[in-house]
């Protein structure tokens, strides 16, 4: 499913990558998973390609006061989008006029969903730093580890 663009940039479907099983030590994803309709499949695929003890580091909008992940939209088997809430679009530097649909807003239940996908441990890391001039809201990173 993966390919390399004419600019040398690798593109993969996070729900069905072309990487071999247990071939990567670390997978990182930054502000992508909220745009993936079947994010649970992306979790399972990431676990598949990680070596035992490998780490999955990712960021996405995370609602720390929200227990459950909220589905904003879904897709049918034919790819048709069904909106469950008012559509929310995030900025897209490649298509600034269009934006990218947000399918979900993650809550604390995502830690259980990562476990269901095969990760042994997962934590939410809140980072704020005066010395590094990260003075706004905390940066929220989720770290999951595949069992050894």
How does the language model describe each region?
Residues 25-37:
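A short SAM/SAH-binding and catalytic strip from SAM-dependent methyltransferases
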Residues 16, 34, 64:
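Active-site micro-motifs of SAM-dependent methyltransferase domains
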Residues 6-11, 40-148:
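S-adenosyl-L-methionine-dependent methyltransferase catalytic module, highlighting the catalytic core
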Residues 1:
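SAM cofactor-binding core of SAM-dependent methyltransferases
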Residues 18-20, 37, 107:
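GHKL-family ATP-binding catalytic core of two-component histidine kinases
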Residues 13-15, 32, 102:
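Residues marking the start of alpha-helices
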Residues 12-27:
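A short acidic, Gly/Pro-enriched loop at the edge of an enzyme's catalytic core
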